[in-house]
Amino acid sequence: MLKQIQKFLKLEAASGILLLVSALLAMIFANTDLNQLYFSFLQTEVAIKFGAFSIDKPLLMWVNDGFMAVFFILVGMEVKRELFEGSLSSYQKAIFPAVAALGGMVVPALVYWFINQNHPEYQSGWAIPMATDIAFALGIVALLSKQVPPALKVFLLALAIIDDLGAIIVIALFFSHEMSMQALTIASIAIVILVAMNRYKVTGLINYAIIGTILWASVLKSGVHATLAGVIIGFCIPLRGKNGEAPLHHLEHALAPWCSFAILPLFAFSNAGVSLEGMSLDKLASPLPLGVALGLIIGKPVGVFLFSYVAVLLGIAKVPEGINLKQIFAIAVLCGIGFTMSMFIAGLAFGEEEASENMLALARLGILMGTFVSAIIGYFLLKITTKPSLMKAA
């Protein structure tokens, strides 16, 4: 179990560096003479036709709706594995990170709402600061990996996985559009087939790829966000086959490098490019970016730590052995690294109409500010609270 976590941490740490480079490249492209090339490339129309069925979308939407669906297959499999075999497989293991994750979703949303309560045009962005970017957060932890207790890494992993699950629920409930009953019917049939294949332990992954593609296309056409199809596919991959095979582990192992080193960096490059032309300090301090940034910088750590602390006081949960509340607070600050997941939700909240483009740019600036500040403060807090001398004193 520990070896698997160490491999995962190494992978995500490398991915975090690549994400940072991708975001910096996007900002350079968006704010130099290359900006026209960058934005026109992202708006290039790409169409797929199969008889009467067709999908015609800009390249940016293929990244956000298509490639990110593959990432959410991985998320679905990770959540399933942790629920059945890992750090969320019992009430005692799950309750502490679950309560922390709940606080990390509720309080940032409240901070954003409080700052934007008099601006109805911005209020659809309330979910943006709820998210945590696991790759970036683990990248920071990896910089101090020799002195960070294993239990603290497991806590962050469990919290982030529950956080992802919360983001999935929010996307399903609040960011779906007008429904197409025909497409939903096809999607429902595909889900029934996937569940049946899981029930009868069908291990041929090509079968899941075929039915999964049908599910993704029908969900895309239905008005529900297409990435949710990825989560469903991930959940339907069997943990064990009839002859002891482990299809979920094999697919997770195969997809993880592609998601870490291709899909997430591509998503970051496609979504982090914000033109600063016409931006002023007044705009940067306006309610939308301020609500997002403060939701991540203040709301996340306060929510994660406060809910954890109250749960311990009430006897609902116990602090995992080998770590202390000071270290929990350092991890809570790192949870303010929203980046890719926050960018994803911002695209859903403000990305559909042309009139929303300015709001989306402001939201992205808020995410970049919140992520940067949370990463810097979180790093130094984690470094201080995990010093061997302090850990012995605790």
Curated annotation (Swiss-Prot):
One of its GO terms (cellular component) is plasma membrane. GO terms for biological process: regulation of pH. It catalyses: Na(+)(in) + 2 H(+)(out) = Na(+)(out) + 2 H(+)(in). It is a multi-pass membrane protein. It is found in: Cell inner membrane. The chain crosses the membrane at residues 11-31, 59-79, 95-115, 124-144, 155-175, 177-197, 203-220, 254-274, 296-316, 328-348, 365-385. It comes from the Bacteria. GO terms for molecular function: sodium:proton antiporter activity. Gene3D superfamilies: Na+/H+ antiporter like domain. Its main location: membrane. Keywords: Antiport, Cell inner membrane, Cell membrane, Ion transport, Membrane, Sodium, Sodium transport, Transmembrane, Transmembrane helix, Transport. InterPro entries: Na/H_antiporter_dom_sf (IPR023171), NhaA (IPR004670). Pfam families: Na_H_antiport_1. Na(+)/H(+) antiporter that extrudes sodium in exchange for external protons. Belongs to the NhaA Na(+)/H(+) (TC 2.A.33) antiporter family. This is Na(+)/H(+) antiporter NhaA. It comes from Actinobacillus pleuropneumoniae serotype 5b (strain L20). The gene is nhaA.
